[in-house]
Amino acid sequence: MKLNDIINIIEDIAPVNLKEGFDNVGLMVGDREKNITKILLALDCTEEVIKEAKEMGAELILTHHPLLFRKPSTITTDTLLGRKIISLIKNDINLYSAHTNWDSVKGGLNDTLVEILGFNKGIIMDKSPVDSEAGIGRVVELTKEMTVLEIINLIKSSLGVKNLRYAGDLNEVIKKIAIVNGSGQDFFGDAKKLGADLIITGDTTYHFVSDYKEMGLNILDIGHFNSEWPVLIKVSEKVKERLDSDVEFIVSKEAKDPFEFI
């Protein structure tokens, strides 16, 4: 199957025009006419993932996070980014990334995280200007009230999360939840305005959390990796089911959270 045909499938599922303005998505490295027999799915294009692709003979790495986020001034082995790009080219491995467009789209990562947690479909926090059914973040009203601790236990069991950070009252009864996969602290204000009692996200920082905790918002920082990788595996099934039967779709074993707990 030609790479360009696979790209058309991905972009039909996650249209490029849904990406955020700061983002860079699409074909990062590659030849659209290349024949693809194996696709490796990963959250990030790490050196370990590139090695994994090389060893298994995968001609395409499909990631959520773009390798080329900002334009590099040079591509040399002096930098980590340069080494990765050179390794991809040397080993004839193509790289495609679908990021905030896949977060935003109806049925994408935001909606799928809501689904995995067993909540009803929510309203969109920040609607896309080009598609009223897409956008970043979801706010859901619970059909059955839950405490913060009960929601934490639900997240742990649903996503396989062992540890997470929280700010708030474990015994507070929650009626409305905001959910933003990945880095979501920029949406704390929106969550509060929309009446959320609690927000589930990753990558929060001290001062944001301190201020919004004082304002009465419970915060669950489940980690960037935990809020996206299990969700990406599920949502990528939509790509897998549309591939030709002779194309193998493989979930990376080297996709790992860079953080560890001690």
From Swiss-Prot:
Q: Which Pfam families match?
A: DUF34_NIF3 (PF01784)
Which keywords fit this entry according to its UniProt record? Metal-binding
Which protein, by its recorded name, is this?
GTP cyclohydrolase 1 type 2 homolog
**Where is a divalent metal cation 1 bound in this sequence?**
H64, D103, E228
Positions of a divalent metal cation 2 binding: H65, H224, E228
- Gene3D superfamilies the record matches: NIF3 (NGG1p interacting factor 3)-like (3.40.1390.30)
- What family is this? Belongs to the GTP cyclohydrolase I type 2/NIF3 family.
| Entry's Gene Ontology cellular component terms | cytoplasm
| Signal sequence, start to end | none
An example molecular function term from Gene Ontology annotations? metal ion binding
Please name the InterPro entries in this protein's record.
DUF34/NIF3 (IPR002678), DUF34/NIF3_sf (IPR036069)
Q: NCBIfam families this protein is in? A: YbgI_SA1388 (TIGR00486)
Q: How does it assemble?
A: Homohexamer.
